[in-house]
A protein has these predicted regions:
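Non-transmembrane, membrane-proximal soluble domains of secreted or membrane proteins
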Residues: 1-295
């Protein structure tokens, strides 16, 4: 009986303790926790912090471009992306009608135009859904929170304050790995994963303990994500709440603002010239989602 009861009690203690720790790790962060997003792509990290409204805005991969690398959804970013797509379509359509092209090239351009038109239609649907959601929920709609988000290549956390870290990926599976924090979470395209953590020692304190003035906590990618995988690292600064507040106030001076790519001049066309489509052409549009293209 002893050989049965003692191991059973021992295992029960281990299991109960393990379940408590597991629940502490996996339960959602508190409502007061700092919200921050880590965005992975080949081959770097980007951080996003909420603006004055304290909430992160909605995102959509179809809005991603050089001016909006995280695909943040706002009325302006939707309008600008539609303008860019229209400019690309018009440029390729002009090439098809004014250039002398082989059939293979014409077929390629037609397929590309069809794809861009499908993307444009989906973004129009997104705009409709956004307007309906804003009309129903008002300021509670996630589509109203993106304009003041802070998109930055720095990662800061306040000391002894809970952080709710959302992790996303643009392209392949990455892994947000904070070795000093013993924390890791996969970054999976198409979904958002989360890490809940509370830093308990600051960067300055670690520099004192390690006697290394150059010490930094580090964010790494723990998946072999491509040829330049080694570039996926970003320092993490853990600082006092006062220092964090000062840094955050400075960062908020440069909120996210979607910017259109510059519209490249149309190439000259002659009877003997094959004109390549400029797939990076873009245009400026107004905030009412009305695009205009100057010929």
């Amino acid at each position: 009986l002893v050989w049965t009861v003692v191991p059973a009690l021992f295992l029960a203690v281990i299991i109960i303790f393990g379940l408590r720790v597991w629940n502490d790790i996996t339960t959602p962060a508190s409502a007061e926790a700092l919200k921050v997003e880590l965005y992975a792509k080949q081959f770097d990290w980007t951080a996003r912090y909420p603006g004055a409204d304290g909430a992160l805005g909605a995102t959509d991969f179809r809005l991603i471009n050089d001016g909006n690398p995280l695909g943040i959804v706002t009325r302006e970013s939707v309008a600008m992306r539609l303008g860019e797509l229209k400019a690309e379509i018009d440029a390729m359509d002009s090439t098809m009608h004014h250039g002398i092209l082989p059939d293979v090239k014409v077929n390629e351009l037609e397929a590309r135009i069809a794809k861009l038109e499908r993307t444009s239609a989906r973004i129009v649907n997104l705009r409709t859904m956004m307007e309906q959601d804003i009309a129903e929920k008002g300021e509670a709609s996630p589509y109203t929170h993106g304009a003041d988000d802070v998109v930055i290549k720095e990662f800061h956390l306040p000391l002894r304050m809970e952080a709710d870290i959302m992790v996303r990926s643009r392209d392949v599976i990455h892994s947000a790995y904070l070795p000093h924090m013993r924390a890791q979470m996969n970054a999976v395209p198409g979904m958002t994963t989360r890490i809940k953590m509370t830093p308990t020692i600051s960067t300055d304190s670690m520099r004192t303990v390690t006697k290394n003035e150059a010490f930094d906590f580090i964010l790494l990618c723990n998946k072999i994500c491509g040829a330049s995988h080694y570039n996926m690292q970003m320092p993490l600064v853990v600082e006092s709440p006062a220092d964090y507040k000062a840094w955050y106030a400075e960062a908020m001076k440069k909120p996210f603002q979607p910017s259109a790519l510059p519209l490249a001049p149309a190439p000259a066309v002659s009877d003997s010239t094959v004109v390549a489509a400029d797939t990076t052409a873009a245009m400026k549009v107004d905030t009412t989602a009305t695009a205009s293209l100057k010929n």
